[in-house]
């Protein structure tokens, strides 16, 4: 009887632990790291590995770096040359990306969704491929059908769910540059904290240390018996062997020979459609039935480089634009968000900290000085950040950005669908919200000095970088 009671207690304890783990997963709480984060000294990070392909290259930041490891993310930069095609690829983690330069078209494969894009005219000569007989006759009037294809351009934030294969083609006259972040600590990733790339086509003949794999990386079809592929796809053995790309050394970004013809909407119509989905007036439409956005039709990108969409705009200082689950609903599913900022010369972003997210700040243009302070009040970063570099800003760490002479442009990825910040200076800051008596006693200053601390900075986000120029409180109150 005693043993039975002990067994019941032990079983109950195990159930409590499992219930807690499941609750953390349902809330999106990342699993604990094996080692505590060492964030006493932050660095400005640059790519450490480059993998070249026929029509572009992939550049990786070391995901084992303590800063990226602690944030639970992996960062890469994709460069697709003119006429280059990034072959279909998916990941075990959700992905968010920003188009730094160029334009193109992209498509994603969502399992279970219908092919809603159809060619208006039958393709010719299809009867000569595949097996003979009846199959060839059926293909004489073949019309290509595929899932949704969208235009992407400079300034777009792109969200991709875990397990959804996607491809990108460069339609512009300059390289298409995209910086990408994988949230490998996300609840959707059921594997370890190593970024894993799954290729439906193409290969990586150079291997990849970012995945701790030095051997050549093939596409997923390469591992199957060719005879099994031929049976599954109802094709000849020779064609099944072609799908495995055994002798193909072009990499995962290939050059398209001739015109690239896929069914896609005109560019102008695409962005007019976006304006219809997000009208400036009341969200009512006679065509809106409440079911217009499902997992199959859900938008995957939002342009945040348009000044008209800025959340904070000051003509002589710059602008800041955020995209979260309210502006791009798919972000609620992958639990990521982004912020785009442009800071003009001799301006600064007021000191602030992220309340509920880690931030990965990537410089897209110019340079600026960034200072970061940790939980012990120590300055853990004070460096110039230039184009192509990134900084990891942990949750709760206060930071400030200052541009001197040159403009500074950046994109920040945040590990929360609705990331929140709290400023340390300005009209909506924590200091502004404190009573004067709390400030005077906390810093041992006079009441007048406390009033200056609270009211000398009327801005909320951006201000001039010049210091030591106090403004009269009466002028601020009157303004």
Curated annotation (Swiss-Prot):
Q: Indicate the secretion signal residues.
A: 1-23
The answer to whether the entry has keyword Aminoacyl-tRNA synthetase is no
The answer, when asked if Disulfide bond is one of the entry's keywords, is yes
Alphabetically ordered keywords of this record? Disulfide bond, Phosphoprotein, Seed storage protein, Signal, Storage protein
Which positions fall inside the Cupin type-1 domain? 42-241, 302-451
User: What family classification does the UniProt entry report for this protein?
Assistant: Belongs to the 11S seed storage protein (globulins) family.
Could you tell me what this protein is called? Cruciferin PGCRURSE5
Q: Which organism is it from?
A: Raphanus sativus
Q: Which gene encodes it?
A: CRURS
